[in-house]
């Protein structure tokens, strides 16, 4: 049995295939942690966290630039200035505004500038309906009074949707308080985080002077949506083609809640000898600046390996549970800052001929803290997240390694992470989308926790092999050009319906990905693919991502293979329908 395990020592943990002369069986990625389903799960989890981030705020400039004016014949000497009713302006701001206009001879334009500056100070804080005015007064004493009417929010009106608890969860505590645009934007973001919502906001006059109401328009979005699709992003050993089905329930409790369930399965099996399946369930409920979220994922893989004249059944099961909260802590004209914290428990089980392999099976608990920034900068939209993942030795963790050495997998470590997603328009109607992920671990991890490079969800141009490492980074780049613009179906004549469903919104895109991994420790027994390396891939594709019917096809090729074997051209497809 020892010789069998030695031959399979690089396969059961689902590591990358080493160089062909390394003595490893000539197979691709096997079952268990590290399979394509594991990469798909990580991709989905990252995408879900990205979808939870609010979009960057408007870059509108609220503050007016102070203007210098010289004394004129029609001016009045102002020796002192008070701003009355400005309870939401700090004493320092009031003092700064007063100092700007005292000790000067002010004309009519200067008085208007003073009012603009007071209004601008309110608008900079989001109080867009508060107004400053000059009451009737005598300026013979040299004292100037500015009075502020702080605009109050009297209520909300919902059109197209039932009010239910929407005000309570999206705009808690705003009624009968000074109107703050930042809080309204936050509530609108909580509504529009639901995939099929596109709520619009309008501020309208209230029933009394100095008051306003907010009208929310949202065409009836429906409660249940879903999509079904197929692709060939799976492993050849466990099922290259896979089918996917997802159901999404939105606002079913009236709490702007969102729930989703997904089931995936390999489309081509082999009488139970090989196959893969994946199940996930996610949910989130907001409350003002807070959002509570959770998720559960499970995947199974099985395939058979022939080596040393014997047939062996390899199996793997992974489960992942996550629960946490996020909060928007800052919102201004630069961007939006969000903090997240969550607990995660991941378990993985590898078997050989249905016998559990203790050294390749474990439970790992984590505590994760993240800070994200959504902003408009450099001519584009950017989402940046810094995270810190702490592997803990309690609250669910179990491992066969009681006193792990440097080369053994650890359960207690610290792993900083970095994620960047950017969208930048380019000349000639091009759009550049870049995605960066990097991580560094202070200890060697189980392979299911290590960075995996090579595949449709990381560095494209690879499928059967990948790199693993405790440290590394990768970048994905798409440059797209939409050639079938919305409305083009009107030029299709009798085929207008076909064009609208299958062509409208289609785009060509180019692919350029790259990445690197490092083991993070030294060991003579490591195969090249586990020591680390640099890989890159490029390709071309055509896709349609909008509308009820979506599809994607691309062809990629490695341009830097590092220690990985040659795979040639890789063709990928995806097609599905939304409802």
Residues of each region from the PLM?
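Extracellular loop and loop/strand-boundary signature of outer-membrane beta-barrel proteins
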Residues: 231-233, 266-269, 306-312, 349-359, ...
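Periplasmic polypeptide-binding modules associated with outer-membrane biogenesis and secretion
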Residues: 19-234, 246, 264-277, 416, ...
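Outer-membrane beta-barrel translocator/receptor signature
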Residues: 211-212, 223-230, 235-292, 300-305, ...
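Transmembrane beta-strand segments of outer-membrane beta-barrel domains in Gram-negative
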Residues: 286, 291-447
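Transmembrane beta-barrel strands of outer-membrane/channel proteins
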Residues: 203, 228-232, 245, 259-265, ...
């Amino acid at each position: 049995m020892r010789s069998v395990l030695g031959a399979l020592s690089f396969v059961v943990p689902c590591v990358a295939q080493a160089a062909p002369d390394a003595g490893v069986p000539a197979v691709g990625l096997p079952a268990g942690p590290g399979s394509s389903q594991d990469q798909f799960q990580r991709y989905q989890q990252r995408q879900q966290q990205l979808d939870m981030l609010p979009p960057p705020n408007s870059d509108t400039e609220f503050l007016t630039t102070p203007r210098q004016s010289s004394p004129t014949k029609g001016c009045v000497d102002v020796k002192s200035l008070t701003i009355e009713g400005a309870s939401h302006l700090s004493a320092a701001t009031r003092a700064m505004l007063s100092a700007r206009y005292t000790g000067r001879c002010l004309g009519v334009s200067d008085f208007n500038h003073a009012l603009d500056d007071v209004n601008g100070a309110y608008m900079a804080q989001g109080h867009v309906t508060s107004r400053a005015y000059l009451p009737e007064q005598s300026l013979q004493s040299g004292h100037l009074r500015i009075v502020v009417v702080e605009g109050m929010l009297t209520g909300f009106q919902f059109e197209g949707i039932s009010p239910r608890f929407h005000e309570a969860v999206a705009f808690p505590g705003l009624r009968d308080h000074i109107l703050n645009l930042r809080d309204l934007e936050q509530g609108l973001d909580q509504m529009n985080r639901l995939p099929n919502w596109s709520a619009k906001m309008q501020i309208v006059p209230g029933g009394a002077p100095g008051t306003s109401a907010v009208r929310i328009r949202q065409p009836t979005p429906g409660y249940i949506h879903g999509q079904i699709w197929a692709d060939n992003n799976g492993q050849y050993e466990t099922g290259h083609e896979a089918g996917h089905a997802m159901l999404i329930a939105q606002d079913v409790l009236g709490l702007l809640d969102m729930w989703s369930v997904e089931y995936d399965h390999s489309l081509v099996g082999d009488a139970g000898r090989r196959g893969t399946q994946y199940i996930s369930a996610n949910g989130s409920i907001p409350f003002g600046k807070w959002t509570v979220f959770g998720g559960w994922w499970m995947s199974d893989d099985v395939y058979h390996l022939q080596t040393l004249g014997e047939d062996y059944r390899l199996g793997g099961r992974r489960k992942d549970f996550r629960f946490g909260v996020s909060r928007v802590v800052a919102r201004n004209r630069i961007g939006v800052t969000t903090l997240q914290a969550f607990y995660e428990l991941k378990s993985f089980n590898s078997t050989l001929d249905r016998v559990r392999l203790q050294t390749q099976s474990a439970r790992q608990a984590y505590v994760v803290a993240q800070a994200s920034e959504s902003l408009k900068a450099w001519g584009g939209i950017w989402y940046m997240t810094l995270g810190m993942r702490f592997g803990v030795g309690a609250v669910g963790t179990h491992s066969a390694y009681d006193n792990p050495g440097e080369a053994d997998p650890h359960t207690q470590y610290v792993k900083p992470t970095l994620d960047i997603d950017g969208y930048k328009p380019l000349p000639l109607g091009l759009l550049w989308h870049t995605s960066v992920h990097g991580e560094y671990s202070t200890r060697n991890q189980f392979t299911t926790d290590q960075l995996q490079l090579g595949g449709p969800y990381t560095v494209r141009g690879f499928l059967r092999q990948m790199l693993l490492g405790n440290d590394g980074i990768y970048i994905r780049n798409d440059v797209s050009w939409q050639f079938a613009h919305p409305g083009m179906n009107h030029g299709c004549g009798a085929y207008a319906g076909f064009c609208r469903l299958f062509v409208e919104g289609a785009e060509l895109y180019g692919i350029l990905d790259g990445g690197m991994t490092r083991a993070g420790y030294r060991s003579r027994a490591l195969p090249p693919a586990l020591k680390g390396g640099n890989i890159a891939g490029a390709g071309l594709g055509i896709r349609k991502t909008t509308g009820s019917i979506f599809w994607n096809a691309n062809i990629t090729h490695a341009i830097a293979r590092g220690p990985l074997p040659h795979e040639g051209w890789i063709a990928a497809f995806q097609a599905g329908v939304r409802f």
